[in-house]
């Protein structure tokens, strides 16, 4: 369960801006802090290249 950043991430920073928990940083590509992430999926909605996948399986 969680957010997965795919290899095609270009580090645009949209996910960082829109994450309500401030759980994402960019260091060339996006990195998710799983301790802060609530798995809401807002970051994925704002990714212009669909490089973020939300795993909702239990």
From Swiss-Prot:
PROSITE patterns membership: 4FE4S_FER_1, 4FE4S_FER_2
Domain of life: Archaea
Location of the 4Fe-4S ferredoxin-type domain: 2-27, 28-57
UniProt cross-references to Pfam families, sorted A to Z: Fer4
Residues engaged in binding [4Fe-4S] cluster 2: 19, 37, 40, 43
GO MF term list: 4 iron, 4 sulfur cluster binding; metal ion binding; oxidoreductase activity
Identification of the protein by name: Uncharacterized ferredoxin MJ0624
Comment on bound cofactor: Binds 2 [4Fe-4S] clusters.
Amino-acid positions noted as binding [4Fe-4S] cluster 1 in the UniProt annotation, renumbered to this chain: 9, 12, 15, 47
Entries under InterPro entries matching the protein: 4Fe4S_Fe-S-bd, 4Fe4S_Fe_S_CS, Fe-S_Ferredoxin
Reported cofactor(s): [4Fe-4S] cluster
Keyword 4Fe-4S: yes
UniProt keyword annotation of 4Fe-4S present: yes
